[in-house]
């Protein structure tokens, strides 16, 4: 069997923290070949290594070191030949730029929040709901496009929470109520991020806009697509009641969530049944065998003091969710602690796995 031809890809926001992670993950990817880099007008026309303030522990990949950076425009050199464009743009500029690329009939897989609530755009956590890609033909039809569309991945904390919630709904039916408190790493604020005087020896009990994202996104992700593949049902007929409190803690990478769950069914499952549901959970990314999918979607920790960001965030190359401290909840039914690598599965890795799945489904060529 002949090897799969690589698909040319571009990265928008290539010099930023998410863009750097995209480049690291794509530099030696079996499906994709880096072909175009986009950044601000200040960086345009220069070699990537000259304009980027590289913040990852690995070196700048040789494949991109001497690539010329262009402005984030669909008519800039290289982008028209790309089968997919990955966006690591900040939300304050992502909306118009991503829409321009889609309007130019290009495929965009975005880490930004701008189109997560769009009724035509899938909001996909690759370990949960790639079935939502079925709305893409309708998105194209509504916008008069042949190839172009936008897919977004979720907020980084939402991603870590909905994977275990999806396992619970798959095994035991609908959830009624979820309360979560997050302890979010400083890397989630980007670079330079939170002032050291604000975060050292401290916990900041507010991340602006974060709680609303978790509360809203959960139902779009865990819901389905209508039978005609033209809308998202947002977990109809009964949405999950979700209440989130989000805090920033002095951890570099790794978002932790403390989750309490009430099931719609009565009696609820036992702790042992919940633990088994987490261990047995598998997802479409694994079944399709895409290269960035984790061997385990959920890693269950038996030690009473795990998961911990320092020890567990890198499991399965940061592409899984860790779960531990599964126990009965005296207020609801079950409570547990979950952990996600916010800079990988919580960001660039999700977009890449989403695109890998789309390749297997014939939605990227």
Swiss-Prot record:
> Can the keyword Nucleotide-binding be found in this entry's annotation?
no
Name one matching Pfam family. Answer: Semialdhyde_dhC
GO CC field = cytosol; nucleus
Look up the record and name the pathway of this protein.
Answer: Amino-acid biosynthesis; L-methionine biosynthesis via de novo pathway; L-homoserine from L-aspartate: step 2/3; Amino-acid biosynthesis; L-threonine biosynthesis; L-threonine from L-aspartate: step 2/5
Q: How is its activity regulated?
A: Inhibited by the competitive inhibitor 1,4-benzoquinone and derivates such as 2-chloro-3-methoxy-1,4-naphthoquinone, 2,3-dichloro-1,4-naphthoquinone, 2-chloro-1,4-naphthoquinone, 2-bromo-1,4-naphthoquinone and 2,3-dichloro-5,8-dihydroxy-1,4-naphthoquinone.
Q: Which SUPFAM superfamilies match?
A: Glyceraldehyde-3-phosphate dehydrogenase-like, C-terminal domain, NAD(P)-binding Rossmann-fold domains
Gene3D superfamilies reported in the protein's UniProt record: Dihydrodipicolinate Reductase, domain 2, NAD(P)-binding Rossmann-like Domain
Any one Gene Ontology MF annotation carried by this entry is: NAD binding
Q: What is its EC number?
A: 1.2.1.11
- Alphabetized SMART domains for the sequence: Semialdhyde_dh
Q: Name one GO biological process term.
A: homoserine biosynthetic process
Give me the residues that bind NADP(+), please: 15-18, 40, 43, 89-90, 188, 342
InterPro entries, alphabetically? ASADH-related, Asp-semialdehyde_DH_CS, Asp_semi-ald_DH_pep-lack, NAD(P)-bd_dom_sf, Semialdehyde_DH_NAD-bd, Semialdhyde_DH_dimer_dom
Q: Where in the cell is it found?
A: Cytoplasm, Cytosol; Nucleus
Q: Which residues form the active site?
A: 156 (acyl-thioester intermediate), 255 (proton acceptor)
Broad class of the protein's primary localization? cytoplasm
Q: Which keywords, in A-to-Z order, does the entry hold?
A: Amino-acid biosynthesis, Cytoplasm, Methionine biosynthesis, NADP, Nucleus, Oxidoreductase, Threonine biosynthesis
Name the catalysed reactions.
L-aspartate 4-semialdehyde + phosphate + NADP(+) = 4-phospho-L-aspartate + NADPH + H(+)
Give the enzyme class: oxidoreductase
Q: What family, per the record?
A: Belongs to the aspartate-semialdehyde dehydrogenase family.
The subunit structure is: Homotetramer; dimer of dimers.
What NCBIfam families does this protein's entry cite?
Answer: asd_EA, PRK08664.1
Main role?
Catalyzes the NADPH-dependent formation of L-aspartate 4-semialdehyde (L-ASA) by the reductive dephosphorylation of 4-phospho-L-aspartate. Mediates the second step in the biosynthesis of amino acids that derive from aspartate (the aspartate family of amino acids), including methioinine and threonine, the latter of which is a precursor to isoleucine.
Q: What is this protein called?
A: Aspartate-semialdehyde dehydrogenase
- Which organism is this protein's natural source? Cryptococcus neoformans var. neoformans serotype D (strain JEC21 / ATCC MYA-565)
């Amino acid at each position: 069997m002949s090897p799969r031809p690589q698909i040319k890809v571009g990265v928008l926001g290539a010099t930023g923290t998410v863009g750097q992670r995209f480049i690291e993950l794509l530099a030696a990817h079996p499906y994709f070949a880096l072909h175009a880099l986009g950044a601000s007008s200040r960086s345009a026309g220069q070699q990537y290594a000259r304009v980027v303030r590289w913040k990852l522990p690995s070196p700048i990949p040789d494949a991109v070191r001497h690539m010329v950076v262009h402005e984030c425009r669909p008519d800039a050199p290289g982008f028209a030949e790309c089968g997919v464009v990955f966006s690591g743009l900040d939300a304050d500029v992502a909306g118009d730029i991503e829409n321009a690329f889609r309007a130019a009939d290009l495929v965009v897989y975005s880490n930004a929040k701008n189109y997560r609530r769009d009724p035509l755009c899938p909001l996909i956590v690759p370990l949960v709901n790639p079935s939502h890609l079925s709305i893409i033909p309708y998105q194209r039809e509504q916008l008069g496009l042949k190839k172009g569309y936008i897919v977004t991945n979720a907020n980084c904390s939402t991603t870590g929470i909905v994977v275990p919630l999806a396992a619970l709904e798959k095994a035991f039916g609908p959830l009624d109520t979820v309360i979560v408190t997050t302890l979010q790493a400083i890397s989630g604020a980007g670079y330079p991020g939170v002032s050291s005087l604000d975060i050292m020896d401290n916990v900041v009990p507010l991340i602006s806009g974060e709680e609303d994202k978790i509360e809203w996104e959960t139902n779009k992700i865990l819901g389905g697509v209508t039978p005609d593949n033209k809308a998202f049902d947002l977990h109809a007929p009964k949405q999950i009641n979700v209440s989130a409190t989000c805090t920033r803690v002095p951890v570099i990478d790794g978002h932790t969530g403390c989750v309490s769950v009430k099931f719609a069914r009565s009696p609820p499952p036992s702790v042992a049944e919940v633990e088994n549901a987490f261990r047995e959970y598998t997802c479409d990314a694994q079944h399709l065998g895409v290269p960035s999918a984790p061997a385990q979607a959920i890693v269950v920790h038996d030690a009473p003091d795990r998961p911990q960001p320092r020890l567990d965030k890198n499991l399965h190359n940061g592409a899984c969710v860790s779960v531990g401290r599964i126990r009965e909840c005296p207020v609801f039914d079950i409570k547990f602690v979950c952990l996600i690598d916010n800079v990988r599965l919580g960001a660039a890795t999700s977009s890449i796995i989403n695109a890998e799945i789309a390749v297997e489904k014939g939605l990227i060529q």
